[in-house]
């Protein structure tokens, strides 16, 4: 679950990281009142769950409450990489002397937390990695031992800071890792982490992603989810316990098991198509869950055909067929649906489809044949 900047900063502040005073606003009038309360120069920052705000004009500096109100009027409603700006963070200005980069993330290759640091903050870390990879310090942390003092000293030495500012930086590194662990994050990124003219180390931005599987023990964070900003298909899938990720293609994908669904995406691409989603109905899915999954996939207006790829182990082929037929009866879906059904009770499932399915339902014996058929039907405009 991705968090807005102001949410991430609130969490980081609880772990001792220094942030600037800020107020969330949803209207230009609220932005003006926030600027009046904060006083002096403020930054008006779009709150969206994506990057590139600065380049898109989503961050403005205002010298007065009136300027803050005008900036808010321009930014609210703006589209930034497909995300509509509905809220702003009005934040006090800072006297910036240096910009650094600091993050903690899960490194799946090493299966350990990874801390990244660079003296080149304020720009995309990918750009830094391409331009000057030697400027990035990478530290793996043993999750059973934690971040050790010598590792903190190594990063502090790499920062080039000295005196009380160096100590402040070391505390920021330690607090960042504690926050990363404490909220079960998969990513905590501060870019930039700035050194002010007074020598203070401050998190000027915060990008935080919390592991969805841990939200049951972080009820407050789970309650921060912005339903309005969420993709409607992904939100509905989460409500009913389906694993769904929206993509940009036109062939809807359903399968049972993450591995099979990933393979299905590959086969559709091999057949020249573009998957519209990842949707895993899971093992043992019953007719109702199958029907709900099909409704969600078909509700994406970009979908022109649906590829239903099921290998029955725990999931029974006859239950899949009943769910598919129930979904079509309930919703009146007229998109072409290509079914590849194998495994437990597959023969019975295919018999049910042959006897009761409408003309828009097609069956194929192999995964590749089914993928080719789904791609062909999508190219024909869904007919």
Swiss-Prot record:
Its cofactor is Mg(2+). Binds 1 Mg(2+) ion per subunit. ATP binds at residues 45, 52-54, 91, 94, 99. The keyword NAD does not apply. GO terms for molecular function: ATP binding; magnesium ion binding; succinate-CoA ligase (ADP-forming) activity; succinate-CoA ligase (GDP-forming) activity. It catalyses: succinate + ATP + CoA = succinyl-CoA + ADP + phosphate; GTP + succinate + CoA = succinyl-CoA + GDP + phosphate. One of its GO terms (biological process) is tricarboxylic acid cycle. The keyword Plastid does not apply. It is an enzyme of class 6 (ligase). Succinyl-CoA synthetase functions in the citric acid cycle (TCA), coupling the hydrolysis of succinyl-CoA to the synthesis of either ATP or GTP and thus represents the only step of substrate-level phosphorylation in the TCA. The beta subunit provides nucleotide specificity of the enzyme and binds the substrate succinate, while the binding sites for coenzyme A and phosphate are found in the alpha subunit. Heterotetramer of two alpha and two beta subunits. This is Succinate--CoA ligase [ADP-forming] subunit beta. The gene is sucC.
